[in-house]
Amino acid sequence: MTNATQNSGDARYLIPALAPIYARLAPLAETLLRVVVGVAFVIHGWPKIQNPLGAVEMVQGIGFYPGWLWATALAATEFFGGLLLIAGLLTRPAALATTFVLLVTVWFHWVQMDQGYKGAELSIIWASVTLFFALNGAGRYSVDRLIGRQI
């Protein structure tokens, strides 16, 4: 790549001298976001694994039957999906599964609880983030990238 080509590509930045910094930090920011989302899912999934009967009661209490099936799926998706996101392993399927869980929570808050956007706001934000990883993959710093395979 010539200097002229590099400079014309940097013209999109208000301060072109920052382009190398952006290029270096963008993959780190993407990794940080993926890890934070993964940790959040692990934190939400762990109590459901520790107290499966409580998880069954919770999902049945909001209308999902059979409770044992939905509680198991929810706990596994949150906990193990979170671990996969943290590692950046099987990122697309893990992110797709967590996106589905979040879309169910959006529906629940919006329709079932009649809270509209106010109740579903955080789920919409998190679903947007997990959808990003479902479509784009884990990024540079991930096990997926290390092994050279992505689904």
What is the role of each PLM region?
Residues 1-50, 68-76, 80-83, 87-151:
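Extended, low-polarity transmembrane helix blocks
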Residues 50-66:
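Membrane-interface interhelical connector segments
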